[in-house]
């Protein structure tokens, strides 16, 4: 699988040279594969939000570099390549608070308009993006501020999707939503990924949620990468995950408890289906020992 985004020795220091100096990223090396869904997990202050702001050039590294398709996104004069902002789309946490246009269509059209596209192309992208996030066409001329919180979030996501980024970065996309709202957003992401084939990064604090959708998990701890692997491999290090201030899925907890009680089960599982398979395998082997 080819790499679309990469960081090499990426370091970011806030307040460098002052009494308030803080290292937010400490020589981070990651490779993000084209077409994958990567979950980014970490406790508050772990560096995950700083990391994603580097991926589309909102922040400039103190050291190291970010490469898009093998090329640094920063030139020798310290300028970020303009195309980076269009190719790596970033949806901030609580994006509904960033809506500002009079109508939904105009808000979604803001990004494509800045790409200097023909009006016909902009209109087509607005329609396609609304459909992708489940917004009815008749809402196009309505005010985004008249929508529910969940619908506003869909508008904000549609505004980034309309630029057709190669990489879509979502910072805590389900924050503040009820369980039904969270399920809807994750379903939206799954559908968009299936239709577009785009690379997607989802920042979350919930292992339970993110493990259900991600191909790999990037676990941040104290400005460094703790793990970057499949969910199953990551959850095989449950003690280290918990030590980093994170939780593990309930299914994984149950399997670990069964292991402690003498049952020969796989403790790296994290879905109900995987747990059922593990229990059947345990039963065939004779159960507890």
Question: Predicted regions span which residues?
Answer:
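Catalytic Walker B motif of ABC-type/P-loop ATPase nucleotide-binding domains
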Residues: 168-171
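ABC ATPase NBD Q-loop/coupling interface
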Residues: 65-83
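Conserved ABC ATPase "signature" C-loop
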Residues: 222-223
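Conserved ABC ATPase signature
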Residues: 143-147, 151
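Conserved catalytic motifs of ABC-family nucleotide-binding domains
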Residues: 164
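Conserved ABC ATPase "signature" region
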Residues: 120-138
